[in-house]
Amino acid sequence: MSSVFGKPRAGSGPQSAPLEVNLAILGRRGAGKSALTVKFLTKRFISEYDPNLEDTYSSEETVDHQPVHLRVMDTADLDTPRNCERYLNWAHAFLVVYSVDSRQSFDSSSSYLELLALHAKETQRSIPALLLGNKLDMAQYRQVTKAEGVALAGRFGCLFFEVSACLDFEHVQHVFHEAVREARRELEKSPLTRPLFISEERALPHQAPLTARHGLASCTFNTLSTINLKEMPTVAQAKLVTVKSSRAQSKRKAPTLTLLKGFKIF
């Protein structure tokens, strides 16, 4: 048996080619995006991390008995969407995260969902998005009710979940797998559509800036060369990292993640 993130796969016998899915995690600084990403990849909870660190991680998953090569971009926007092309033209699906104990993060999630809706209109395609209320373990300090989350998700026609990165792994895994299912449905509808990968130096079709038409700061749809390169992460910063697991060795011992620089894992 060979083991990678996700379920173990047999080392012999014919294997169908894995579905490739790119998933971007969006949200305000402090909403718990990195904690959710690491929880999904390692079953562990992190208590400290660098909010300025942005990376893309690779995981081999099995969703509905189908192998999936999942790439997860843990974005590093601070308070509002910034330089959005790096994920809008890359991801097949999006997780928009807010913290149930932060009204500001909830308001920011509305901005991200609006951005995705505008991009869907611009590109004339459906963009799968899931709204995620994180830090359910902090429910006693709630500033956002579950009903408000349901209403916001309903407004944009997306799925809604409440979870906690520091509690059950299964709930976090379920959300990520639901994102894969949503992406898979859209890919099956238009299999020839391929997103622009971060490392490709290819210009996008010229369009008028969204800033001028919709007032979304720093989010434009011009060519990649027009983006403020000081704010956009370099290819080296937004590298694809494959992290292997020792999960097969022990069901009780969580795998060790060694390539997440800036994280403190417990």
UniProtKB/Swiss-Prot annotation:
It comes from the Eukaryota. Its EC number is 3.6.5.2. GO terms for cellular component: plasma membrane. Keywords: GTP-binding, Hydrolase, Nucleotide-binding. Gene3D superfamilies: P-loop containing nucleotide triphosphate hydrolases. GO terms for molecular function: G protein activity; GDP binding; GTP binding; GTPase activity. SMART domains: RAB, RAS, RHO. It is an enzyme of class 3 (hydrolase). PROSITE patterns: RAS (PS51421). GTP binds at residues 27-34, 74-78, 134-137. PANTHER family: RAS-LIKE FAMILY MEMBER 11. Belongs to the small GTPase superfamily. Ras family. NCBIfam families: small_GTP. This is Ras-like protein family member 12. It comes from Homo sapiens (Human). The gene is RASL12.
